[in-house]
């Protein structure tokens, strides 16, 4: 590998100011030199993989007392050749990869951990684009546009801080992207329903999320957090907000707070989220559009959980599982549109582990037939509402005190439930 000195003009981001900084001594190789730049404050290094010189191999920073390797970058891209995070010597439990100065991270290949499996975090306030990206030898994966927060007292990762607004002075720090693209996570994947999942256990933490096409597929949970400036992952901890003297005196523009799942002109059966465990969406002050299919094959009563706070959810597609839990509070609104369907795939009631039972039929029943959910819980506050203009089918419907006042069914031909139960 050739080593050369490079002078890169970067931008340091704070909520109120930005300044230029000179960075020296990047390790250089013509195959990936424009893909991975290690920040000067990071002890990680990068080299070409011995068996594939087109592939970058990152020798990660030493771990702290809690097993966290914290790596900082000025640029972090992954081509279809993939990238390796070498964890053989460090044996970290969590590998944080934070882009502190740089453009949106473009992930088009596999991100593999060599050595001990670990939780891999990719954090970039400028956004992340996953185009058929995947992970291997990971315990779980976190894609976030927030800044990881480490507790200085005990070295633990306690959560992420996200920006809900941006000052006009600061917009140049985001590579000239329009404001509706800042802090955005975009997925664009193949229509792939195979048993080979791209993720093991996926966490998506961003206030601006879009699935353009295809599926986000995870072996375990898919957990989405949106709409908050602070996301706590360590119970009992808190993130202290940093105050900036100029902040209150500078006009700030609010960043979008939205989740768009699928192309509204696409086939809902060929895009969406697929999990063998749970799909959980935690959203506050967010507008959500589902044009795809949210599918869980877990047998839990809460296989798909929508925890909505001051949030609007417009379901144009499918929500399919044995059990669903909708928690609506503080003026939240769930609208199951005319094209929306909430139920259970017929194959899930056959005891089969997946829907690849036959090409077209399960016995004499078409494979894509939708039957009633086993359990659907609608925990709706007095100031929140659910309106159904599509199809909702469940055997047991659980509500507060068997109350249906906040549930409006506009489909007289659809009997939502067989049995009405009280939430225990």
Predicted regions and their residues:
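Classical Sec-dependent N-terminal signal peptides that target proteins to the secretory pathway
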Residues: 1-22, 33
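Solvent-exposed adhesion/ligand-recognition segments of exported proteins
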Residues: 20-277, 283-284
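Detector for repetitive beta-architecture
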Residues: 57, 75, 81-83, 104, ...
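Intrinsically disordered, low-complexity Ser/Thr- and acidic-rich flexible linkers and loops
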Residues: 247, 347, 351, 357-365, ...
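Extracellular beta-rich repeat passengers
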Residues: 347, 396-398
């Amino acid at each position: 590998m050739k080593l050369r000195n490079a002078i890169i003009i970067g931008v340091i981001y704070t909520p109120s100011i930005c300044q230029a900084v000179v960075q020296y001594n990047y390790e250089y190789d013509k195959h990936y030199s424009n893909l991975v730049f290690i920040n000067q404050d990071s002890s990680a290094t990068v080299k070409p993989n011995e068996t594939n010189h087109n592939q970058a191999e990152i020798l990660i920073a030493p771990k702290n007392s809690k097993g966290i390797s914290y790596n900082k970058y000025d640029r972090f891209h992954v081509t279809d050749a993939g990238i390796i995070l070498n964890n053989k010597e460090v044996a970290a439990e969590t590998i944080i990869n934070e882009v502190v100065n740089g453009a949106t991270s473009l992930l088009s290949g596999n991100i593999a951990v060599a050595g001990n499996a670990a939780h891999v975090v990719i954090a970039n306030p400028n956004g992340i684009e996953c185009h058929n990206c995947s992970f291997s030898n990971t315990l779980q994966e976190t894609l976030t546009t927030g800044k990881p927060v480490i507790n200085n007292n005990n070295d633990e990762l306690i959560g992420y801080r996200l920006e809900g607004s941006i000052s006009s002075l600061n917009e140049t720090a985001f590579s000239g992207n329009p404001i509706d693209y800042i802090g955005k996570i975009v997925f664009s994947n193949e229509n792939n329903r195979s048993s080979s999942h791209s993720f093991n256990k996926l966490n998506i933490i961003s206030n601006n999320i879009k699935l353009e096409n295809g599926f986000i597929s995870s072996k375990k949970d898919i957990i989405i957090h949106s709409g908050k400036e602070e996301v706590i992952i360590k119970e009992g901890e808190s993130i202290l907000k940093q105050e900036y003297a100029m902040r209150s005196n500078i006009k700030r523009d609010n960043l979008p707070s939205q989740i768009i799942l699928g192309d509204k002109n696409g086939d809902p059966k060929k895009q969406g989220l697929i999990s063998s465990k749970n799909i959980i969406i935690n959203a506050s002050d967010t507008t959500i559009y589902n044009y795809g299919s949210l599918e869980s094959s877990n047998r839990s009563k809460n296989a798909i959980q929508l925890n909505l706070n001051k949030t609007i959810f417009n379901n144009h597609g499918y929500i399919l599982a044995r059990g669903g839990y909708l928690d609506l509070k503080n003026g939240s609104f769930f609208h199951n549109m005319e094209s929306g369907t909430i139920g259970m795939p017929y194959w899930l009631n056959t005891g089969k582990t997946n829907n690849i039972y036959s090409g077209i039929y399960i016995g004499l029943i078409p494979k894509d037939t939708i039957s009633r959910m086993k359990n659907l819980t609608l925990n709706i506050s007095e100031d929140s509402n659910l309106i159904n203009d599509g199809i909702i089918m469940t055997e047991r419907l659980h509500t507060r005190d068997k109350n249906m006042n906040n549930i409006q069914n506009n489909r007289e031909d659809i009997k939502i439930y067989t049995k009405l139960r009280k939430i225990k």
